[in-house]
């Protein structure tokens, strides 16, 4: 049920962000007096960290129930490889796809600051309640968990909120009111008073990383030797993984920093911590069977051996599994019959990325290409899939209408090989609904995903199928961070060896043909983009490396002019502003807010929906196709 958590230490949080925070919990309220009276009450408060991450809500702020995973994929909608086909008007994911993320003029861009400061409040409350002089070993572990999570939250938030001036000279942007160079976010800890919170300027990014690195050092100290009970708890391997992320971030922004300017040192540390995380975790990369399992694929932390840290929805927490329009299984589901948007809003891979990915790479099974929508049991012998057209180009196969809509809903008419498509639901059901009549204008060039499966493969029952786990950290990320660090230290050969070692577990014939640092970097980021599509990591990499957003080209699978973005280097839609509650409650931020440039400046002025549609199905040349701006790859 939904409860308010009232704690004496609310002074340690931003008043405007926490006055009406709600968590979607299956348990009763935990109040401050209980914390000091029993270890079990403290443990309940720690558990609220995990429940908060699968169901945060703030009704006063206009925040629907949203999870950590849903926030991450919301951010990823602003990147090149994430395409949003189908009926996606009037929804926040569509807004992020086009860059309509004003935090003061709508509810689209307000989620990051509300959500992360809500999370930070929870861990601050626990930290503030523990007396080090009288703490038990269990309490010290709780401290370690809280410090690790606080480092995670601030690391995410500072990357989201740091303003980077757009560099694409084709467009004119709104400038900030004040100089935002190297500014991060207001820092709120367990020691921040209410008075301080009401006049709390944006700390520099360097100062935020001071806190992050300090918190990780505390987490490392308190979690040393601890054997966790569940993957929702950070352990030492996760702390090392967070260190690897932090030093990768620092190495990538030395030219913007005031304090953290030792690029070579940070790349070296990033590689060392990635290695330590791999060794400490005992995790191995996902197998094809684990990845594609229709019942547990990307939804079960225990069956996914590579997952180092995860969120989890308790079976009794049906509200977190079903409430609102941001349930992760709903957002990313293709085969489900439940939800608000459900299968009518596709989450798809960019067409050029799909075409570039080798057919020998089993990760390609994560998306449905044109052959899936064309294939039927009466296809021509020897042909990969059926495409029959008359002289005018109209489809004439008896399963299709000239508009390209599937008119047959009979499973017997279609190829439903479970070994090939790995659906719990029938492939024919998916085909009969993902088509032009349901708003998928780019049909059959859709590339909608089936990477994220409903819990237990249950595509009918929301309370069950919606209760999915989400990977916060996977060991595969550590291999990519190691390869990137090697590319910036020991060189191309070492980075290629690490990259090839990982990708050969996905495609046994893989070989990286690139020979220069820039080209190896580009290939590394492409493979990482495929690996972590839909998990949010690509957003942080794109913004960190200023790779631009290149979702439009003739033959692209985008469906709306507002989504057809071709932006070099820094996309304005990556950076929301602070919400009105924060601006009004913390006047020190008011004149230092991130500016908002309307997406119409860089989208609809260039092309129309009809112009986009006229190019569907055109041949595209993958070799030389621009996926990333590579200036920072040198």
Task: Please place each PLM-identified region on the residue numbering.
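Bacterial Sec-dependent N-terminal signal peptides
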Residues: 3, 8, 15-43, 212, ...
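Membrane-proximal, proline-rich intrinsically disordered regions
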Residues: 20-74, 133, 342-345, 353-359, ...
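Short, surface-exposed recognition loops and adjoining beta-strand edges that mediate ligand/DNA contacts
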Residues: 31-33, 67-72, 161-181, 225-328, ...
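Extended ligand-binding clefts on enzyme/binding-domain cores
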Residues: 55-56, 265, 279-463, 468, ...
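Conserved, well-structured interaction surfaces
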Residues: 87-164, 199, 203-208, 217-229, ...
């Amino acid at each position: 049920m939904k409860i308010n958590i009232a704690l004496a230490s609310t002074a340690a949080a931003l008043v405007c962000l926490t006055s009406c925070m709600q968590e979607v919990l299956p348990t009763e309220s935990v109040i401050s007096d209980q914390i000091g009276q029993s270890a079990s009450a403290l443990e309940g408060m720690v558990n609220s960290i995990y429940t908060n991450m699968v169901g945060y809500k703030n009704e006063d702020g206009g925040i629907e129930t949203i999870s950590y995973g849903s926030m991450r994929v919301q951010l990823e909608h602003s990147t090149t490889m994430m395409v949003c086909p189908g009926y996606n008007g009037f929804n926040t994911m569509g807004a992020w796809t086009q860059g309509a993320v004003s935090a003061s003029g709508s509810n689209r861009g307000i989620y990051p600051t509300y959500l992360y400061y809500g999370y930070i409040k929870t861990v601050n409350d626990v930290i503030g309640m523990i007396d080090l002089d009288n703490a038990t070993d269990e309490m010290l572990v709780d401290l370690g968990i809280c410090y690790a999570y606080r480092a995670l939250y601030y690391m995410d938030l500072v990357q989201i909120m740091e303003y980077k001036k757009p560099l694409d000279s084709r467009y004119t942007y709104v400038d900030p009111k004040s100089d935002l160079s190297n500014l991060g976010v207001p820092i709120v800890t367990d020691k921040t008073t209410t008075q301080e919170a009401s006049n709390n300027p944006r700390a520099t990014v360097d100062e935020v990383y001071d806190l992050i690195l300090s918190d990780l050092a505390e987490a490392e100290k308190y979690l040393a030797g601890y054997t966790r009970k569940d993957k929702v708890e950070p352990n030492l391997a996760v702390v090392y993984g967070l260190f690897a992320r932090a030093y990768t971030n620092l190495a990538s922004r030395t030219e913007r920093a005031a304090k953290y300017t030792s690029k070579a040192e940070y790349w070296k540390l990033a590689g060392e911590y990635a290695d330590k995380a791999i060794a400490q975790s005992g995790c191995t990369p996902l197998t094809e069977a684990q990845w594609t399992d229709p019942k547990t694929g990307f939804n079960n932390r225990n069956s996914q051996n590579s997952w180092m840290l995860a969120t989890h929805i308790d079976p009794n927490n049906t509200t977190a599994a079903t409430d609102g329009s941001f349930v992760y299984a709903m957002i990313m589901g293709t085969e489900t019959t439940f939800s608000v948007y459900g299968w009518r809003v596709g989450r798809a891979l960019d067409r050029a990325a799909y075409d570039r990915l080798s057919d020998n790479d089993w990760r390609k099974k994560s998306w449905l290409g044109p052959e899936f929508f064309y294939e039927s049991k009466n296809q021509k012998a020897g042909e990969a899939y059926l495409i029959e057209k008359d002289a005018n180009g109209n489809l004439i196969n008896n399963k299709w209408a000239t508009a390209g809509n599937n008119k047959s809903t009979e499973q017997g008419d279609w190829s439903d090989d479970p070994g090939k498509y790995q659906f719990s639901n029938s492939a024919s059901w998916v085909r009969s609904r993902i088509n032009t009549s349901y708003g998928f204008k780019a049909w059959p060039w859709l590339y909608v995903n089936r990477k994220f499966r409903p819990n237990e493969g249950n595509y009918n029952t929301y309370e069950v199928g919606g209760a999915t786990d989400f990977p916060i950290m996977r060991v595969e990320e550590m291999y990519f961070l190691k390869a990137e660090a090697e590319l910036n230290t020991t060189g191309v050969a070492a980075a290629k060896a690490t990259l090839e070692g990982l990708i050969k577990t996905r495609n046994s014939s893989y070989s990286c043909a690139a020979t220069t640092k820039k080209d190896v970097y580009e290939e590394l980021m492409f493979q990482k983009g495929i690996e972590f599509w839909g998990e949010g990591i690509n957003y942080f990499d794109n913004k960190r490396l200023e790779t631009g957003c290149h979702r439009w080209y003739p033959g692209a699978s985008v469906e709306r002019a507002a989504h057809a973005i071709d932006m070099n280097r820094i996309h304005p839609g990556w950076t929301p502003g602070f919400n009105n509650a924060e601006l009004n409650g913390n006047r020190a931020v008011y004149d230092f807010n991130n500016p908002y440039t309307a997406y119409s400046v860089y989208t609809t002025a260039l092309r129309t929906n009809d112009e986009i549609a006229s190019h569907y199905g055109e041949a595209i040349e993958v070799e030389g196709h621009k996926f990333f701006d590579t200036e920072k790859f040198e």
